[in-house]
């Protein structure tokens, strides 16, 4: 015979005596002598010498009188230390971690009841066993690109479940089926969903057996935003990737309106206070598939060496600070290149029109006019606004073919051969100076995809990297170094392109790797670090796997206002003056 359960009064109907409240406070105070201690409510209920309904009422009363129940199941002292942390994504819910922001500490796992997504900033409370999530501070990413995972047989139900495309977001989003438009193909389409603003921070997870795992997954209430694209379709995948990584494809109406008001060609008023260089035979040298041309070069020989002019598209003439064009460009930061298409930083009227140094038309530029001696040293430079007229849209393939004396290349470059030979001679001394200062020069291969007419990938090939590429690279280095020196001389705040020395731990790892191949090196401190690494790179050019190991030893280059030099290029100061059409910094 089963035991009959006694009926309990609702908590709101329980009458508490002052003695019971005092006794409960005494018990809790004893548990919280250490301000960092967190008492479990269920344990507190068990410790009360009274009926469970009374004990639950006492716990509620304590919450109202100063002791916080911040984590639903816990009591914390109101003065308990707090901090913040950021949730890191993972493939499985149990692998998600929190990285503390405002306190020292390593990553730690989340509590099973915390409902979080990667990127969430959470409040942390310190307990006797360490920091624990206590609440949501902010959720920077509410929108997720998802695919439907509800079984086909169950799609007639009221709710649909979706899983983010990202492999590092082990969550599920639940949407009312009536919110999803009928034209959305739940089998093939990726959609964008937004997590509800009132989604609870603490909630019970559900087991998602169809993931092939016995783990419990977090479910968030969400709303349908839009259809993104068809999965496994070339154009659809580009749209999906853009949405997944926050790449805006469409420009705002205000930006398009501002672009539309710009002239179709350079007008006479724009030429005021500009140097007229239209008589100089500037050329652009780019890849065959390039569509925007933001730099042009011209070189002439001098008694001491060469005069190099690098003309960069003057985007700032058309994109003024504070305009919608400027705000959209800031938001995008760069153009984003897909294998067969590009999402531009600027509207096409600018990126492929007014700001592109197309052949046969006048274009506004900012010119770096530099003198280089026969040791490859820049002895003088100046910057000024100018107007140029490109005399040729050349490709790396054609230029290299011409410089090798091949008939096809010579016919393609035509009368520009003289300028190209001068550029090549200048490149020779710049390349020698590069070796002299022990700049690091990795020989890496770049692969490119081959596409069918319908956008499907049909193969891959290795991009050729020849001296025509290197001519332009060295010319851009000259201009960028001059830009950095100019900013320093004028005491102007700017973003430098900086690259720090490798960390000692990574150098030690590299020593161990190379030792396995019978290669050793000795360091005497920072003074011989670059020469040693440069020689290692030279000695392993025929061993790509070792080149990769050396490359992974390097720190990542970044932009910052504090100049620390560029270790890889061995420059005391370096900035990016070039590529303004596709790069905002």
For each feature predicted by the language model, list its residue ranges.
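Charge-lined substrate channels and their catalytic hotspots, especially those that engage the 3′ end
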Residues: 2-309, 316-361, 393, 398-401
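Electropositive polyanion-binding surfaces
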Residues: 9-12, 198, 207-213, 230, ...
């Amino acid at each position: 015979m089963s035991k009959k359960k006694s009926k309990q009064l609702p908590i709101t109907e329980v009458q508490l005596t002052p003695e019971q409240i005092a006794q409960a406070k005494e018990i809790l105070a004893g548990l919280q002598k250490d301000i960092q201690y967190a008492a479990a409510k269920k344990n507190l209920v068990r410790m009360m010498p009274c009926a469970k309904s009374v004990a639950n009422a006492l716990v509620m009363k304590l919450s109202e009188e100063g002791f916080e129940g911040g984590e639903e199941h816990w009591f914390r002292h109101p003065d308990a230390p707090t901090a913040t942390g950021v949730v890191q994504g993972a493939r499985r819910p149990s692998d998600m971690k929190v990285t503390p922001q405002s306190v020292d500490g390593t990553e730690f796992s989340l509590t099973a009841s915390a409902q979080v997504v990667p990127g969430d900033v959470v409040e942390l409370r310190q307990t006797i066993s360490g920091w624990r999530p206590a609440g949501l501070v902010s959720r920077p990413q509410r929108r997720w690109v998802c695919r439907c995972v509800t079984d086909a047989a169950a799609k007639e139900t009221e709710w649909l479940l979706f899983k983010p495309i990202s492999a590092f977001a082990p969550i599920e989003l639940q949407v009312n089926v009536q919110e999803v438009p009928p034209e959305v193909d739940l089998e093939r389409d990726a959609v964008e969903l937004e997590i509800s603003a009132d989604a609870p921070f603490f909630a019970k997870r559900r087991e998602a057996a169809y993931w092939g795992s016995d783990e419990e997954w977090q479910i968030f209430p969400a709303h349908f935003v839009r259809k993104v694209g068809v999965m496994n379709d070339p154009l659809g995948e580009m749209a999906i990737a853009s949405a997944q990584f926050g790449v805006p494809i469409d420009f705002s109406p205000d930006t398009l309106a501002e672009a539309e008001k710009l002239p179709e060609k350079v007008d006479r008023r724009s030429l005021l206070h500009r140097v007229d260089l239209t008589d100089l035979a500037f050329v652009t040298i780019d890849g065959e598939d390039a569509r925007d041309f933001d730099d042009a070069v011209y070189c002439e020989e001098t008694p001491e060496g060469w005069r190099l002019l690098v003309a960069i598209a003057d985007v700032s003439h058309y994109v003024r600070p504070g305009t919608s064009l400027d705000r959209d460009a800031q938001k995008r930061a760069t153009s984003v290149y897909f294998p067969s298409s590009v999402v531009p930083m600027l509207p096409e009227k600018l990126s492929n029109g007014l700001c592109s140094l197309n052949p046969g038309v006048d274009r506004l530029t900012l010119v770096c006019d530099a003198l280089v001696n026969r040791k490859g040293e820049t002895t003088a430079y100046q910057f000024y606004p100018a107007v140029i007229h490109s005399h040729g849209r050349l490709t790396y393939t054609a230029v290299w073919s011409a410089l090798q004396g091949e008939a096809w290349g010579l016919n393609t470059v035509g009368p520009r051969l003289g300028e190209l030979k001068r550029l090549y001679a200048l490149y020779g001394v710049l390349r020698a100076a590069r070796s002299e200062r022990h700049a690091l020069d990795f020989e890496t291969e770049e692969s490119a995809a081959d596409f069918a007419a319908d956008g499907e990938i049909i193969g891959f090939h290795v991009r050729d990297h020849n001296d025509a590429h290197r001519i332009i690279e060295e010319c851009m280095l000259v201009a960028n170094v001059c830009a950095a020196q100019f900013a320093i001389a004028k005491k102007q705040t700017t973003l430098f392109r900086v690259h720090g020395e490798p960390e000692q731990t990574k150098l030690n790892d590299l020593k161990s790797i190379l030792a396995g191949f019978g290669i050793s090196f000795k360091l005497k401190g920072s003074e011989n670090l670059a020469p040693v690494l440069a020689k290692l790179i030279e000695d392993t050019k025929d061993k790509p796997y070792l080149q990769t190991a050396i490359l992974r030893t390097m720190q990542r280059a970044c932009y910052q206002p504090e100049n620390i030099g560029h270790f890889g290029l061995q420059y005391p100061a370096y900035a990016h003056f070039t590529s303004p059409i596709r790069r905002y910094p």
